């Protein structure tokens, strides 16, 4: 009985702390046409303190969505346009010599912001990608002999073009794993496309104002961490991730030759955190299997290595995840 009372109290706190989520969604929808899943995914990454990678062809509002979200939050924002000639110092900062006092001074890079847009991250070579991804992992940056903590909250929202396009450098598996979510952006519907045309030819570019603060985001994250996950849900999450490593143990022997590696423990942690954030968005103080299923593709799609056989057969990680989710027993 006490547990149910606790859940009711938690639901009340979530209702109180999550009011800004509605305002964020309204603000996003004023600028972004459609793309409901994209907006929801950005909110999940924001609430679960997990970096997000958006993939899609140019022109699908990836950059606009991230920029709009940052404008709706009263916090520091910076944009890094990744190009082949970008240097690590252009991202994290460097030491600059001053002739006036004959000393080196630290010049901090654009990574020192609450929200960092890493635009077209796969346009820059590996050493530049590594500079940003190290900052993502450690939440600190070393310039010269000094180490500087990054601001709180610190969230990297990156975009990339599909790897088939020319002039792109594929992110290594170990680095892309640091993104909690990888969201693939699709084309809008016909009706949405017509609305996009109408808004743009009329010059109807709506400006948004901040509706919340960085402090409110941190308070909401503290509540998200209290969202209850039952042992059966923990087992469900672990089973899904284990099925990517040992599919034959879950009656999916046909997947064994299609997977070179499965999700790591980081995948399990990310799946639990994302499911909690999704429950919070739905104003619930506990996680249900539907929450896990709602986020599993975005959490897992970049954490499964496909074999040559899978690629030759045009089998995607999404198909493998769907088969696993359909097979693993739901609590």
Regions found by a protein language model. Give the residues of each.
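Walker A/P-loop
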Residues: 46-83
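Conserved alpha-helical scaffold flanking the Walker A/P-loop in AAA+ ATPase domains
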Residues: 41-44, 97-117
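Pre-Walker A (pre-P-loop) alpha-helix and adjacent loop at the N terminus of AAA/AAA+ ATPase modules
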Residues: 13-60, 242
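Walker B catalytic acidic pair
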Residues: 56, 119-120, 131
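Conserved C-terminal "switch" segment of AAA+ ATPases
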Residues: 13-18, 31, 168, 182-254, ...
């Amino acid at each position: 009985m006490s547990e149910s009372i606790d859940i009711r109290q938690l639901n009340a706190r979530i209702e109180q702390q999550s009011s800004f989520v509605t305002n964020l969604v309204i603000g996003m929808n004023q600028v972004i046409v459609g793309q409901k899943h994209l907006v929801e995914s950005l909110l999940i990454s924001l609430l679960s303190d997990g970096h997000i990678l958006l993939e899609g062809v140019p022109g699908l509002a990836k950059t606009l969505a991230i920029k709009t979200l940052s404008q709706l939050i009263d916090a520091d924002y910076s944009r890094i346009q990744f190009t082949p000639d970008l240097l690590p110092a252009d991202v994290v900062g460097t030491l600059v010599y001053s002739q006036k006092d004959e000393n080196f001074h630290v010049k901090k890079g654009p990574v020192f912001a609450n929200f960092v847009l890493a635009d077209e991250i796969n346009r820059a070579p590996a050493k530049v990608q590594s500079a940003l991804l190290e900052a993502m992992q450690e939440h600190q940056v070393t310039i010269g002999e000094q180490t500087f903590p990054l601001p709180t909250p610190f969230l990297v929202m990156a975009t990339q073009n599909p790897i088939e396009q020319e002039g792109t450098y594929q992110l290594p598996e170990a680095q892309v794993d640091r993104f909690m979510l990888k969201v693939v952006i699709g084309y809008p519907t016909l009706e949405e496309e017509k609305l996009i045309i109408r808004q743009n030819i009329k010059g109807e570019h709506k400006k948004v104002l901040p509706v919340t603060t960085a402090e409110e985001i941190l308070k909401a994250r503290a509540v998200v961490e209290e969202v209850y996950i039952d042992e059966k849900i923990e087992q469900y999450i672990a089973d899904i991730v284990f099925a990517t490593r040992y599919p034959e143990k879950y009656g999916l022997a046909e997947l064994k030759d299609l997977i070179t590696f499965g999700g790591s423990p980081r995948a399990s942690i990310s799946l639990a955190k994302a499911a909690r954030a999704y429950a919070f968005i739905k104003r619930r103080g506990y996680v249900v299997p539907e929450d896990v299923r709602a986020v599993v593709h975005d959490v897992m799609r970049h954490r499964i290595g496909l074999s040559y056989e899978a690629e030759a057969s045009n089998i995607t990680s999404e198909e493998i995840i769907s088969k696993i989710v359909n097979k693993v027993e739901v609590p």
